[in-house]
Every structure is written in C-alpha cells, then in structure tokens.
Curated annotation (Swiss-Prot):
Species, as recorded: Kosmotoga olearia (strain ATCC BAA-1733 / DSM 21960 / TBF 19.5.1)
Record text on subunit structure and interactions: Homodimer.
Protein name from the UniProt record: Bifunctional protein FolD
Gene name linked to the record: folD
Keyword Amino-acid biosynthesis belongs to the record: yes
Enzyme nomenclature, EC number: 1.5.1.5, 3.5.4.9
Endpoints of the signal sequence: none
Molecular function per GO: methenyltetrahydrofolate cyclohydrolase activity; methylenetetrahydrofolate dehydrogenase (NADP+) activity
SUPFAM superfamilies: Aminoacid dehydrogenase-like, N-terminal domain (SSF53223), NAD(P)-binding Rossmann-fold domains (SSF51735)
Amino acid sequence: MGILLDGKPVAKMIYAEIKEWLGNLQEKPPKLVLFCSEPDDSTKTYMNSIVKRGGKLGISVEICHAGENPVEEIKKLNESRDVAGVMIMHPLKNVDEKLVVSALSLEKDVEGRTPGNLGGIMTGDESFAPPTAEAVMEILRFYDVSLSGKDVTIVGRSTTVGKPLSMLMLKKGIDATVTICHSRTKNLVEKIKRANVLVSAVGRAGFITKEMVGKDSIIIDVGINLYDGKIVGDVDFEQVEPEVAAITPVPGGVGIVTTAILFRHFMVSSRRMVGRR
C-alpha cells in the first residue's frame, strides 16, 4: 500500500504563513482581482471558491468583468495601488486572451501566465511559476521526496503544468532527469513504467492504470475530472495505490495546494506593494 501524499497539511502550512503575514499588517491588504469575460459554470464555481477562500483569510477578492477594451482595463489594474494580484480567468470569451495576458504586469501575475514569468522559470530569475506546477514541487518538498538523479516522467505538455514543471525540476539543486510525454509519444507505457516519479496532467479519468506503473514509483496526480458525478484524477486510484510507493489523492491533493500557492503569490506581491507605499 502506497504512502498517501495528502495535500491538506501542505495547504495548511501555506495558509499559516499567509495568516501570520496578515496578522502583522498595519494596514488593510490590497485586493485580488478575478478578471473574466462571460464565464461558464465551471469557471464561476472556481471563481466562487477563490472568493470564499479569500474571505476566510481576510483578503478582499473582487470580480471584474471585461469591457470593450480589456487590454486597457488590465493596464489600469497594473497601475492600481489597491490591487496586488490579478487572475485572468480562462477562457476569455470574445477576447484575445494572449493579448490580455501579455498586458498584465509580472508582479501582479499570481498565476504565472505571462511570457515574462514563464521565461523567468527557464532562466532561473525570480518569478511566479504557474501555481499547479509549484504545488507539485511543494508537495514533494513537504514529504521529503528528493528528485536528484531521479527519472521523472510528466504526461502533459501544457504551459500551466508540464512545461513549467519540467523547468522547476531541472533547476540546479533539484537535478531531476525529466521526460515529457504527450499524445504523440511512442512507447508511452514504457516511459511511464520506468519513471521513479510520474506526474500525470492529462485530464482523462482513469488514464493511468496499475499495469503502467512501477512498484517503487511515486505518483503525482494533477488531473481533475468529473466521472460518474464524482471528482477523480487521471489515475485509477483504487487499482494503482496498492502498487506504488506513494501517491497523491484526488480530491485533496495537488488541487488544494494549488489554491494555497495562488494566495502565497498574492502575499508576495502584496508585500512588494506595501513596501513601496
């Protein structure tokens, strides 16, 4: 039976940092803005969860609906001394999302989506990494999982998980050997089975089965899928969990740590802003 890499104590640790910072503030913290355009039901649910979490922490979260000139609206948020973080809710309907994201300042890009922040991960500059990628690293650190010299296979090549996570794992001092797989990868099962650490970010329920994993492997399940009315990951948890050394659950794993990382990024951005006031 594998060790459960539970995300709850990791998130709790991060929220404790944030609460300590808030408790020491001499003034009201800046706002977090959720910038959206005709959000669908799943996006609304996600936005509501961020608003709720902000309320629990004592952080004001404001929803801003895109108008006729979203790029100019983002630039105004960049200049606002009352806003420390902006989340651009994907997808932005009837809007050039790349243009809007590129207009956001690096300092307020708490999701690590701007070209500047993504580039900073590659060059080793201080920047905000996409929270899901950072959440994976935070879980591994919390449970003392060393990646040095380990073979890591990441299934998924998105700019929110696969690509930035590979850069974080390749950093000097982390020193993983990383393979990124995708829909065109040949011999996928072979590459997954030989991995010391597997990260699945495919978005397909039950994609990873027990036949695909090694006995001593560590499984990080980034997937969030709705299956038979339940939230499940990419990994067939019931089958795979007894076969591996350690595994993250879904829900209760990477997802809840991702939200905590978002608010940590907001805290960092707020500290910079308050220092300039």
